[in-house]
Structure formats: structure tokens, C-alpha cells
Amino acid sequence: MKKATVICDMQFGSTGKGLIAGFLAERDQPDVVVTAWSANAGHTYINREGRKWVHCMLANGIVSPKLKAVLIGGGSQMSIPTLISEIMGSLDILQGKSILIHENACIIQQRHVEEEAGPMTKIGSTKKGCGAAMMEKIRRNPESKIVAKDFIDDGLEIPDFKLDGTVGFKDISRHFEELGVCIKVVSNEVYLAVLHKAERVQVEGAQGFSLGLHNGFYPYVTSRECTPAQICSDCNVPISMVDKVVGTMRTYPIRVANRFDDEGKMVGWSGPCYSDQTELTWEQMGVTPEKTTVTKLTRRIFSFSRMQTRQAMLVCMPDEIFLNFANYCASEDELASIIEVISNEGGDVSYIGWGDSAAHIETTLEGDWSDDTNPLFNQYNKSSNIA
């Protein structure tokens, strides 16, 4: 049965996946939302009332009015302290809901963070331990505790979690049961049963197409692919279940910050751009510099690329495009020219983002759910940023 929407980033990340995910979840009302994120990037959603969610572990689709379950796929690299913090921040909307972690989801531990803090990191990594944890999982050492099912009884490193004795998922489950939220590590069989019984599913990807291990500028890439096919694989979502792919883009793509030591020497370059792109400065743009959600470092910013658009379209083949940061364009003609490039490469710009909240999303879909009055260019031009 076709019932799943997949959200994927068509550039270098930070295109507003969290924003469109929250918007679509409130509109489409999925009962199951799915991710297989790593704890190295934040996804932000601000609703129409101004409430803000910044998530690295929980899908932004938790705002769905019909939510029943949040699935965290086996392809995830999880930070359990981060997960706990995010649940605590949304206890009101998670009452009576289930957070189900696939038994083979990877658990980041302090040794992984320490490993990435060393000389292996020369490519502008967020240094959250995600790549190191993934490598340990791939090594498949039977004596290694690395996936969720290894920590049912104990072994979790959660310094701020107030429990007596050793901490395992059973302890966490009991703690949150008293708070009205079900959180469990589940078998593949149970995970699949919940997925297939869902009426509507929303699947949220991370990072971006041009950061993909195979499609990106190797070695200046992330540790896996960022395509709809990879997102579905990491979440155990059958391709045949997908009836819509929503690709996210921005008018001026970004890359994460370069890394510098205490003396100002560059020790980590985040990588190149496409040959038809130019790296710009925030001063040239005339907007407040953006900082990454997790590391709080200033992002690099580039001009729009037809080459990037073409390659992402050919691999991701989205049904709809969310074009974000329209407020960064200097004129309506500039915005129109970017939309024309996307259209000429086969993309359908169905949503336009003018600011940092759901109230700033304009939809071009006839009869779609939107504000009574759409945002105006002059009102939002260069007025706000999205994390």
C-alpha cells in the first residue's frame, strides 16, 4: 500500500527539512513518523504559534495531530542523552504515544566522540561520534556493545539521567512510563508490524544529497548516502510504500563551517562546491550569518547551482520541491530565475519558504492548506534566518 512521504535534502543540508516536515505533518496528519538520523545535525520546526522544536533524534513530525508512534530506524546513530532531552521537551504532545527504537540502531558512546576529536577529523566534521560509532558497527565485533539491543539492561552512558544503579533501556522505559510516554527497543518484527499497520507514514531524511558518500565530493562527505532510496533503507521503509518524495532546496546553498585551531590555522576544510557555484560572504549577502544548529559555527554560503540541481533531480526524482530562503533573494526576478532553473531540470516548486516558521511557507498547490494571505516578497525579503 502506498502511504509514505519521504523528505530529502537536495543540496548540502540545512535547507529547512525540519520546517517542511512539521508543516506537512500538521497538514497530512501521519500516525507514524520515521527517522534514522545521526546525532550530528539539528532539524528545526517553528509552528504558527511560535513554538520551536530543535531535534537531532526525534522526527519533527511529532506535531502530527494523529500521531501514534515514532520509529527510529536501524540505520540511526543515536545519542541517548539527546533523545531523552528531546522527549522531555515535548512531553505534552507525546502523552500516550510510543517511541520505538529498532534493535539494531547504533548507540553513540563517549569513546566514539573522543575518537573523532583526534587527528582523523580533517574534513569539517561535527565531531559528535557518529562516524566512529558507525565504523564500530560495521566491524561486527561480537564482543562489542554497539546496537540498542546490547543495552537493554545496562551500559548506557547518561551522566544527567537521575537513576540509581546501572542504566539500560529498561530503566529509561520505566522512567518515561510514569511520565505517560512509551519508549522501547523493539525487534525488527515489531518495528515492521507498526510500520505496515500505519495509515499514513512520514519519513524524514537528514543531511543532503551533495554530502552523500557516493554522490558527494569525496572525501568531503558524510558517512552514508542521503538519497530517498538510502533514507528508506535506513528506516526499513519499502520503496513500494512511498507515494511522494518532497525534495528540499534553498536559494543560496550552504556548507558547514571550516575548522580552525586556537591559533586561527585551518585544520578542517568542509569541502568544495560545484563548478558553476561561487562561494559568497554573509556580508555580500546582506543577511545575518547563519550558525549550525549543533556546533554553533558560521556556515559557508554559495550561489545557486544548476549542476547540483540536475544531479539531485536525476537521483532523488522528487514529486514536489520546497524552495526555502526565498527571503535571501535581492529581487523577485532573482527568485523567479532560480525557480525556472529547478523547473527546467524537472522540478516542481510546490512550497516556498520566506522565513523561519510554518507561517512563512507559501504553497503553490491548488486547494492546499495555507495562510489566508500568502507572505509577500517585500514583507519577508532578507528578514529572517532558519537554523
UniProtKB/Swiss-Prot annotation:
ATP binds at residues 14-18, 42-44, 207, 324, 327. SMART domains: Adenylsucc_synt (SM00788). Keywords: ATP-binding, Ligase, Magnesium, Metal-binding, Nucleotide-binding, Purine biosynthesis. Its EC number is 6.3.4.25. Its cofactor is Mg(2+). Pathway: Purine metabolism. DGMP binds at residues 14, 40, 125-126, 140, 222. Coiled coil: none annotated. Mg(2+) binds at residues 14, 42, 293. L-aspartate binds at residues 293-294, 299. GO terms for molecular function: adenylosuccinate synthase activity; ATP binding; magnesium ion binding. InterPro entries: Adenylosuccinate_synth_dom1 (IPR042109), Adenylosuccinate_synth_dom2 (IPR042110), Adenylosuccinate_synthetase (IPR001114), P-loop_NTPase (IPR027417), Phage_PurZ (IPR046383). The active site is at 14 (proton acceptor). It catalyses: dGMP + L-aspartate + ATP = (2S)-2-amino-2'-deoxyadenylo-succinate + ADP + phosphate + 2 H(+). One of its GO terms (biological process) is IMP metabolic process. Belongs to the Caudovirales PurZ family. HAMAP family: Adenylosucc_synth (MF_00011), Phage_PURZ (MF_04166). Involved in the synthesis of the atypical nucleotide dZTP (2-amino-2'-deoxyadenosine-5'-triphosphate). Catalyzes the condensation of aspartate with deoxyguanylate into dSMP (N6-succino-2-amino-2'-deoxyadenylate), which undergoes defumarylation and phosphorylation respectively by host PurB and guanylate/nucleoside diphosphate kinases to give dZTP. dZTP is integrated into the viral genome instead of adenine by the viral DNA polymerase. This Z-base probably completely replaces adenosine and forms a triple bond to the opposite T-base. The resulting non-standard viral DNA is called Z-genome. This is N6-succino-2-amino-2'-deoxyadenylate synthase. It comes from Acinetobacter phage SH-Ab 15497.
